[in-house]
Amino acid sequence: MEVELKFLVEDQIARERILSDKHLAEIMDKGSLEEIDMSAVYFDTADLDLCNNEIAFRVRRENGQPIATLKWGGKVENGLHMRGELNVSVNEEYAKNPSLSIFKGSEIYEEIEKAACDKPLKPLLEANCVRKQMRVDTGKSISVVSLDLGEIVTSKGNAPISELEVELYSGDEDDMIALGRELATKYNLKEGAKSKFRVGLELLGYKKENKL
């Protein structure tokens, strides 16, 4: 299960200050600050069977290492995103010709098999960004704080990525939410109601409501 807060960071000065925030520096796990180059391609059938069943499938390279990910269901409320998530490290051969069969045996496989019905998959959109992230420990929760800058790319237009994510790793969910709200208030951030995938779908003209 993925549990994260998402905020839009529209001001460059705010982006710079978040990364050097005094409170984050105090609770950051030493050596956890890192920069990750991310390049994601989302796939679906020609009929968007996965989207229509509130399932997202992507292959994302993180500093060159491809990872296949499924996300499904969940809810979004006041910038808090909760959904099912499954990640599998894959090789380059798989990344060039991805298949849902790699998730066979998982809790979601029967559902995705029923949704896609062995139809071929095609690239739908891309989300490319540079992520700067750190792991923080408040004593009550451990979270990953990430700042993403980049672009969503579709055949019908592009959109910028400039967002802050605070994702719960372990511990108390309310404590993680309090940390995220503290940062949002301090830097005047807007709640992010839409995932990168959802923004891309809307660029493509996809109208059906879902929580992806």
Regions found by a protein language model. Give the residues of each.
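Phosphate-end processing signature that detects enzymes handling 5′-triphosphorylated RNA
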Residues: M1-L212
